[in-house]
C-alpha cells in the first residue's frame, strides 16, 4: 500500500475488487478536521498510472448516521493529471456497473468524485495542487512532505517538485498566512539539504518564474548565515565546498558562481556595517 506522509485518512478505491481501504495516520490526533486522499496503485487499470493522487477533500462527520459527507478541499497534481481526472470521472460514475459495488452504501456520494474530476480538468497540472492546497490551508512544511521532498535520497536539483514547492511557498507567504515565514522556509531547506547544496539549488532556480523573488531571499538568508559565521569569500571554497584549489574547477562550474555571488553579498554588507560604524 502506498504511504502518504500527511493528511489523516487515506481512502483507496480498487478498480477491480471494489474495496475501499481507509487508514488513519498519526495526524488524526492533532487536527480537528478529517481529510481523505484518493489515490491509485499500480495494480489498478492501466489508464491510471502509479502514484497519481487525485483528490484531497475534507470529511465532516454526519450528524445522524455517522456517515462521512465529502466536500471539495484540494486536489493533487501530477504529470498524469489529464489522464487521471478523466479516469476518475469514468470510475466515479461507472463503479457500480464495473465492480458491482455501491459507493453510496459506503457512505460516499459518487457525484462528489465526478465533480472533483470535472473541477480538476479546468486547471493545469502545474498549478492545481498549489491553488487547492492554499484553499485547504495546507502550510509549506506539510506541502514539502506531500510532495515527497522529505524522503531520504531525494534529488532536489532539476526536480520539478522542488520548483512546485517554492511556487507554493511564495504564494503562501504572499497571502501573509501566519506560522511559516521566509526564515522557516530557509531553516527547512537548510536542515534537509545543507548549506553547500542549498546554495547550488537556489542558483539553479534564480530565474524560476513565480518563485525567483523567494529564491533570492532564501539565497540572502544562506549568505547571511555564512556572513554571520565570519566566513570570508576566499574561505568559502575550502570551508564550505571543500575545494582545495578553485583554479582546477571548470569555468562553468556553478560553485564558482556561488562564490562570486557571495563575495558581492559580503562586500555590500561590509560596506553597510562600516557606514554604521562611521556614523
Swiss-Prot record:
Has UniProt tagged this entry with the keyword Signal? yes
Question: Which keywords describe this protein according to UniProt?
Answer: Glycoprotein, Repeat, Secreted, Signal, Virulence
Query: What is the top-level taxon of the source organism?
Result: Eukaryota
Extract the ranges annotated as region (L motif): 178-208
* Compartments, record wording: Secreted; Host cell
Q: What is known of its domains?
A: The RxLR-dEER motif acts to carry the protein into the host cell cytoplasm through binding to cell surface phosphatidylinositol-3-phosphate.
Name of this protein: RxLR effector protein Avh331
Task: List the source organism.
Answer: Phytophthora sojae (strain P6497) (Soybean stem and root rot agent)
Tell me the organism's taxonomic lineage. Eukaryota, Sar, Stramenopiles, Oomycota, Peronosporales
Amino acid at each position: 500500500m502506498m504511504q502518504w506522509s500527511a493528511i489523516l485518512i487515506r481512502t483507496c478505491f480498487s478498480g477491480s475488487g471494489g474495496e475501499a481501504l481507509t487508514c488513519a495516520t498519526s495526524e488524526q490526533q492533532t487536527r480537528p478536521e478529517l481529510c481523505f486522499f484518493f489515490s491509485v496503485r499500480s495494480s489498478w487499470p492501466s489508464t491510471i498510472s502509479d502514484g497519481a493522487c487525485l483528490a484531497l477533500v475534507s470529511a465532516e462527520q454526519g450528524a445522524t448516521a455517522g456517515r462521512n459527507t465529502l466536500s471539495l478541499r484540494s486536489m493533487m497534481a501530477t504529470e498524469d493529471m489529464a489522464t487521471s481526472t478523466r479516469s476518475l470521472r469514468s470510475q466515479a460514475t461507472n463503479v457500480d456497473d464495473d465492480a458491482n459495488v455501491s459507493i453510496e452504501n459506503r457512505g460516499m456520494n459518487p457525484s462528489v468524485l465526478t465533480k472533483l474530476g470535472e473541477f480538476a480538468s479546468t486547471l493545469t497540472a502545474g498549478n492545481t495542487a498549489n491553488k487547492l492546497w492554499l484553499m485547504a490551508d495546507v502550510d509549506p512544511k506539510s506541502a514539502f512532505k506531500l510532495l515527497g521532498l522529505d524522503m531520504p535520497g531525494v534529488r532536489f536539483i532539476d526536480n520539478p517538485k522542488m520548483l512546485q514547492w517554492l511556487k507554493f511557498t511564495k504564494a503562501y507567504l504572499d497571502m501573509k498566512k501566519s506560522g511559516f515565514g521566509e526564515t522557516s522556509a530557509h531553516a527547512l531547506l537548510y536542515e534537509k539539504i545543507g548549506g553547500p547544496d542549498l546554495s547550488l539549488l537556489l542558483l539553479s532556480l534564480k530565474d524560476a518564474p513565480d518563485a525567483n523573488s523567494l529564491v533570492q531571499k532564501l539565497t540572502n538568508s544562506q549568505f547571511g548565515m555564512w556572513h554571520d559565521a565570519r566566513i570570508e569569500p576566499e574561505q568559502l571554497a575550502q570551508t564550505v565546498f571543500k575545494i582545495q584549489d578553485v583554479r582546477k574547477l571548470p569555468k562553468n562550474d556553478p560553485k564558482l558562481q556561488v562564490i562570486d555571488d557571495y563575495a558581492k553579498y559580503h562586500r555590500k554588507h561590509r560596506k553597510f556595517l562600516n557606514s554604521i560604524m562611521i556614523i
